[in-house]
Amino acid sequence: MSQVQSGILPEHCRAAIWIEANVKGEVDDLRAASKTFADKLATFEAKFPDAHLGAVVAFGNNTWRALSGGVGAEELKDFPGYGKGLAPTTQFDVLIHILSLRHDVNFSVAQAAMEAFGDCIEVKEEIHGFRWVEERDLSGFVDGTENPAGEETRREVAVIKDGVDAGGSYVFVQRWEHNLKQLNRMSVHDQEMMIGRTKEDNEEIDGDERPETSHLTRVDLKEDGKGLKIVRQSLPYGTASGTHGLYFCAYCARLHNIEQQLLSMFGDTDGKRDAMLRFTKPVTGGYYFAPSLDKLMAL
């Protein structure tokens, strides 16, 4: 069985770093850098076992086609944007995702990544995420309640089982900027109707009692009676005095599941948009493919 990259399946990480970059050098340089980073990561994982460190290197559509010779990741495409500009695209070539229980270890691994990739990439965005109180979003609502739990369940949702892409996963990242002043002008009841859950105790509001535009309704989708699940690795980010919000990060064996949620959220299916757009907005968006660790090392 192909080995999955170590940052896809962990649960309850306390800190993460996401780095998005474009390729500057040759594809062969990127191949070598990816292997070098994987070796460095293994050293850190052995040195800090209690940190439960994991990381992922993933590639945008054009870069993956160049690396793989056009083989595999058939669903992969550039992030097109949705909602007539409400969800903008900022597609880049490479995504590096580092997560663990320790920010200091994450930072050291990020430094190692910069050393490994060097001049063959140009960093376009680097975001440091943190686990907030009771795994809540900065809005005060618990985040990721429906996230699959347990390694096997998460593997079933996030990891491609067989074929040329076995052990791989599709990745979506999207940075949201919150306007908490706008949120706090709303009553708690209105906030709960917007999200579809109670704020304090995180109880789901019955479907016939919450609006069609509630966040829960927009993303709780089914096809042929089966839920379109994703594995989320999202975390809050930002500063108290400046920009802050949620860095949304999802892994799935099918890009289809992710895209259907986005189409629903941004009104591209029935014209109804996610009500949480009243206080927050996405400012980035990119699709990537994370090959298995075996394939990453064999590029």
Segments (PLM) and residue ranges:
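Long, histidine/aromatic-enriched segments associated with O2/redox biology
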Residues: 1-299
